[in-house]
């Protein structure tokens, strides 16, 4: 039974899931808006919003924590210096999910996830 299970497995092993979320979050930070499946977008939302909250502290420990999660110097720099300062006054809700279409190959619902 799946009762009260805390996250989506997305049909992947734990390491594959971690790599997927890391790569999706780097793409979202670099481009501001990406298209993915609704399930991945919902899981990515919680991952990215936690990173933005940590990056908003804007000290060296925040920088280290974000880099530990992303492993990308460019994305870390952009998140800490450009994106997070815009959301300092905001208490969560940094992303928006918009359902777009049904994918032709497997009829999966697709969605845009973007930074507000």
Swiss-Prot record:
Give GO cellular component annotations, separated by semicolons.
Answer: cytosolic large ribosomal subunit
Annotated InterPro entries: Ribosomal_bL17, Ribosomal_bL17_sf
The record's GO molecular-function terms, alphabetically, read: structural constituent of ribosome
Protein keywords: Ribonucleoprotein, Ribosomal protein
What are the GO BP annotations of this UniProt entry? translation
The record's section on Pfam families has: Ribosomal_L17
Task: Provide the assembly information.
Answer: Part of the 50S ribosomal subunit. Contacts protein L32.
The record's family statement is:
Belongs to the bacterial ribosomal protein bL17 family.
The name this protein goes by in its record: Large ribosomal subunit protein bL17
